[in-house]
Regions:
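Short, conserved phosphate-binding/catalytic loop or strand-edge motifs used
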Residues: 117-122, 143, 167, 186-189
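Intrinsic disorder at enzyme termini
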Residues: 172-173, 179-198, 202-203
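Sequence-specific dsDNA recognition surfaces
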Residues: 8-58, 69, 75, 79-83, ...
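Basic, amphipathic alpha-helical recognition segments used for DNA target recognition
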Residues: 8-12, 67-128, 211-216, 247-254, ...
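Amphipathic alpha-helical coiled-coil/heptad-repeat segments
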Residues: 1-6, 128-184, 344-399
Length: 399
């Protein structure tokens, strides 16, 4: 390892306030040319057509003054806010890419909400080698990162393929491709030919029927305004769910962040454990069963099945119709559908024996998908750990 010299970051990087480069309008469009940046994970938050105040003295590092997150930038840009510093490397001492990579492994407590660069972060000392040695280290880091990125891209494609496969499984299941041809003896009010003319052909033992004929559907209740009035939650003991908690639950909802007290319960409704929850606003067509008695707002619909339909069958069918239900939502800031849309949703109905068979076939395939996805997620986590390991070795002179 050649001799490395210690410097404070402020000796290696000069800073500039971002104020002249802050975007004036948040009317972003992918059709516009200039990216608007944040130093956080989102990085490019949109594109602007503004032509003044574009930063173009490149390359630079943008530094989030509150979280200490950084991004390396080698293209003209504007910024979202003043919550950052624009850092320029002293190229007589350090390569911009080298110091950027070095900053990725600095351990720093940023739990206090304040600006850090001037008083604290810039005082951190790091060791750097000669410029030729820096070039070699950067080249080796990027060679290894390129190999790692190729692997990560393959893993991400695998996850995308799994999502496509899941939808294909659901599509085939509700077109009767897994059928064992049990005869449906139940006489119900079937959907008309007009209502089903654009729907897939299903086995002759099956019939199409509106979801409202298979169970009771009802919106949750949260009548009081404002909805976050503290008195609703005083002495809370009744779980109050949000659409995000339905989405996060996957199958059974047992976790929640809010609880109604008696005042809250009086203006709501307590739904029993086992109710199928279906979201109709923000997160559309997310489903999960209540693992507890709970209240929920009118952005969630509760479904209670009749004796001739299995709730798991309905849950999987709603999952298969997610894109279709999204299409019913008007083009507003927050997507939503109404109760009528769910009530009139046409469901392929079959005997209870067949429903059990469909559920088993779906869940067997989904279990395989889940196991593969867990393996992929572990590999992605390992790839990120490997990235940190590469950087650590690089700056210990071990690459």
């Amino acid at each position: 390892m050649t001799e490395w010299t210690e410097y404070a970051l402020e000796d290696l990087l000069s800073y500039e306030q971002p104020t002249p480069y802050i975007v004036e309008s948040t009317d972003y469009s992918d059709n516009y040319k200039t990216p608007v940046l944040t130093a956080g994970k989102s990085f490019i938050i949109g594109y602007t057509n503004e032509t003044n105040g574009i930063y173009d003295k490149l390359p630079v590092i943008i530094f989030d003054d509150f979280t200490t997150s950084t991004q390396y930038v080698n293209f003209p840009f504007k910024v979202k806010s003043s919550a950052m510093k624009i850092l320029t490397a002293n190229t007589n001492l350090v390569l911009p890419k080298f110091i950027f990579y070095r900053m990725q492994i600095i351990e720093f407590d940023h739990s206090t909400h304040k600006r850090y660069w001037i008083q604290q972060y810039s005082k951190i000392k790091v060791k750097i080698p000669s410029l030729p040695e820096q070039e070699k280290i950067v080249a080796k880091i990027e060679e290894l990162f390129s190999e790692l990125d190729n692997g990560v891209e393959t893993l991400k494609k695998t996850k995308q393929q799994l999502a496509v496969y899941r939808q294909a499984v659901l599509k085939e299941a509700f077109e009767g491709k897994f059928t064992t041809h049990f005869v449906c003896e139940k006489e119900l009010e079937w959907a008309s030919a007009e209502e089903t003319k654009s729907l897939p052909t299903i086995p002759e033992e099956w019939q199409y029927i509106a979801l409202s004929k298979l169970g009771d559907l009802g919106r949750g209740k949260s009548k009081h305004r404002p909805r976050n009035d503290p008195k609703l939650f005083e002495d809370g003991k009744y779980p109050f769910l949000q659409t995000s908690e339905v989405k996060a639950a996957k199958r059974y909802i047992t976790e929640y962040s809010k609880m109604y007290g008696e005042v809250g319960l009086q203006q709501s409704k307590l739904w029993p454990k086992g109710t199928l929850c279906i979201t109709i606003a923000a997160n559309i067509a997310e489903t999960a069963f209540l693992g507890i008695d709970a209240c929920f707002p009118d952005s969630v619909v509760g479904f209670t099945p009749y004796e001739y339909i299995l709730p798991e069958y309905v849950k999987h069918f709603i999952e298969s119709q997610k894109l279709r239900l999204w299409a019913f939502a008007p083009a507003t800031a927050q997507k939503n559908i109404n109760l009528d849309t769910l009530e009139n949703l046409i469901v392929p109905y079959c005997s209870l024996e067949e429903q059990n068979n469909v559920i088993s076939e779906i869940e067997a395939r989904m279990t395989i998908c889940d196991n593969i996805e867990k393996t992929v997620d572990i590999a992605l986590q390992q790839a990120e750990a490997m990235r940190q390991s590469i950087l650590k070795k690089a700056f210990e002179g071990e690459l």
